Amino acid sequence: MEATGLITEYNPFHNGHLYHLKKAQELTKADVTIVLMSGNWVQRGLPAITDKWKRAQAAIDAGADLVFELPFYYAVQAGEIFAQGAVRLLSDLQVSSIICGSEHADIDFINLAAHEPDISGNSNFDKKNRTFASNYAAALEEKTGFYLENANDILAFSYAKAILNQNLTEKIKLRTISRVSADYHDQFLNDGEIASATAIRKALSEGQNVDSYTPMSDLQYTDYEARLFQLLKYRLSTDGLGQIRSIYQVNEGMEYLIKQAIEKNPSDFGELLALIKSKRYTFARLHRVLVYILLNIKVDQMNLAMQNPYHRLLGFTEKGRQYLHEKKGRFNFPTISHVDQKTANKSLAIDYKAGLVYNQIMDYKSTQDIKRTPIQS
């Protein structure tokens, strides 16, 4: 059986994602569609609008055959690590293609990535007045004639780099689908039936009805920031500089900025971010670092987790079950479908902890991991 892979967040699953899934199946004619989806926390270091089980159910209902969780240690990362981890897992699941959306579906991203520039020591760019991303895009344009700036193009480029870096060009074909109707960062609902996840989340936060934009029913917005801030404020107030410095991705003296910020007694999460923010750090990076601190994820713990990946099964159809049976013994990484306390404390330690905190700030009662079984359809 041949499988195609989709790398997703589904935050929430909406009509654009449905189009992507159906188009991927149409283009590849694959026997099985595998969705690799971020769990309860998404790449920007924020909690997903609804938990991984409801989003996995939406994917299965829409026609996915297998849904696996992209573990926290890959999901809540800068784009390059996110892409490298996702491609690594899908490669082990033996997909023959990865289908992603892009603003320029006519671009050969593998060829583009093969011309990746090295801007280190490049005196043509004034790094004091431009971000690394701007310098990089300009260097790439200089070499290829293409200016990389759109969100989905950047992701496609990251997947292409991951395929090249892992020597998978003979094994996995990267194909892109043109994004339709809504831009990735669009803030407002449009008159059609496809809106960005950003716009849908914003509309939900304002009490608007979004039923025409998503097949997911009963979506609700939870104002999580106050709970998140209280937990984080306690952690930052009681941890010393050495403890904060030991956290993954806390470097370049960031611990001093964070400590100084919390000592100014910010009133909410937004004010805390504003006190830490500088040109050196994007808001996305700060979100991620603060979540790493909240979850007390040390450098060695994160590195160890990334060295020992696994496939966490969230849902499957009969065809998906057949695929797993056919491929039994051929995956290098273990497949986890049932979680007991021992597994939660060892293999799934980071994701288990992330699920517990997610439940607290989102006011969820259902367990996220222990004794949860994959969705079957």
UniProtKB/Swiss-Prot annotation:
Its EC number is 6.3.4.-. One of its GO terms (biological process) is tRNA modification. Catalyzes the formation of N(4)-acetylcytidine (ac(4)C) at the wobble position of elongator tRNA(Met), using acetate and ATP as substrates. First activates an acetate ion to form acetyladenylate (Ac-AMP) and then transfers the acetyl group to tRNA to form ac(4)C34. This is tRNA(Met) cytidine acetate ligase. Disulfide bonds: none annotated. Belongs to the TmcAL family. HAMAP family: TmcAL. It catalyses: cytidine(34) in elongator tRNA(Met) + acetate + ATP = N(4)-acetylcytidine(34) in elongator tRNA(Met) + AMP + diphosphate. Gene3D superfamilies: HUPs. It is an enzyme of class 6 (ligase). ATP binds at residues 7-20, 101, 152, 179. GO terms for molecular function: ATP binding; ligase activity, forming carbon-nitrogen bonds; tRNA binding. GO terms for cellular component: cytoplasm. It is found in: Cytoplasm. Keywords: ATP-binding, Cytoplasm, Ligase, Nucleotide-binding, RNA-binding, tRNA processing, tRNA-binding. The gene is tmcAL.
